[in-house]
Amino acid sequence: MKSIIVYYSLEGNTEYTAKEIAAKLGADLLRLEPVKAYPTGKVSKFVWGGKSAMMAETPQLKPYQFDAAAYDCIIFGFPVWASNIVPPLRTFIRSENLKGKTFAAFACQTADGAGKAFAKLRTELGIDSLAAELILLDPKSKPNAANAQKITAFCDSPCFHK
């Protein structure tokens, strides 16, 4: 099964995880980048990122190469913002024809909200369930054995080995 990891990363936790999963699965990587970058300041990232996520904004993305027909499985990766998916992911989903694909997702969070974010992702995709889900707490900035075990278990999911 040919897979691609489509992700957005602000501070590197999601990118770190995407690369770990890609190495284990042999998946391709597609990093989404908005034309106008989000701020990374301690307060401003929460204010602007949270507002953007809660308002379901769809920012313009920098050009990327993607052919949906080349993949059976799409794995979405994102940081959790205000219990929501990140706006660049929403833009991608609404811009691409993803019908007939298997979907999985991983979310990186500092506190809580990934469960609600996964529900919003399923709604955005128009599906009832994801083939695999993974929630990590700051995997790059606070590495630990539990996160590594969760990544391995996620990659061992039958949906990736059909």
Give residue ranges: language-model regions.
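A generic structural motif
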Residues: 31-34, 106-107, 132-138
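Structural beta-sheet core signal
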Residues: 5, 76, 104-107, 132
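N-terminal beta1-alpha1-beta2 submodule of the flavodoxin-like/Rossmannoid cofactor-binding fold
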Residues: 1-76, 83-85, 90, 94, ...
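Short, aromatic/basic amphipathic alpha-helical patches
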Residues: 116-125
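Short, conserved loop/helix-junction motifs that constitute active-site signature segments
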Residues: 94-100, 124-127
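Short Gly/Pro-enriched loop/turn and capping motifs at secondary-structure junctions
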Residues: 80-83, 109-113, 138-141
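Glycine-rich phosphate/pyrophosphate-binding loop and the adjoining helix
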Residues: 129-162
